[in-house]
């Protein structure tokens, strides 16, 4: 597969689609494909099953999240607010 140091994972597109689009795709896909921390067992083993569905390879927990990341910025905010309300702080 045609990959280089600069284009990395987007080398598969070759000369098509332009530099800006490929940079955006590269940033999203590299972040998406790395291992994420599981919310159940706190170990790095979460991989993307399909769009918005994530699975931990260590404990087998399956949960929903964002399309490209298991925890979205809005999800973090909501969890923080719920924790604050339930915790009484």
Curated annotation (Swiss-Prot):
Cellular component terms (Gene Ontology): ribonucleoprotein complex; ribosome
Zinc finger (C4-type): 38-59
Cofactors demanded by this protein: Zn(2+)
InterPro entries in alphabetical order: Ribosomal_eL37/eL43, Ribosomal_eL43, Ribosomal_protein_eL43, Ribosomal_zn-bd
A Pfam family this chain is assigned to: Ribosomal_L37ae
GO MF terms held by the record: large ribosomal subunit rRNA binding; structural constituent of ribosome; zinc ion binding
Domain of life: Archaea
Keywords attached to this entry: Metal-binding, Ribonucleoprotein, Ribosomal protein, RNA-binding, rRNA-binding, Zinc, Zinc-finger
Stated family: Belongs to the eukaryotic ribosomal protein eL43 family. Putative zinc-binding subfamily.
Protein name per the record: Large ribosomal subunit protein eL43
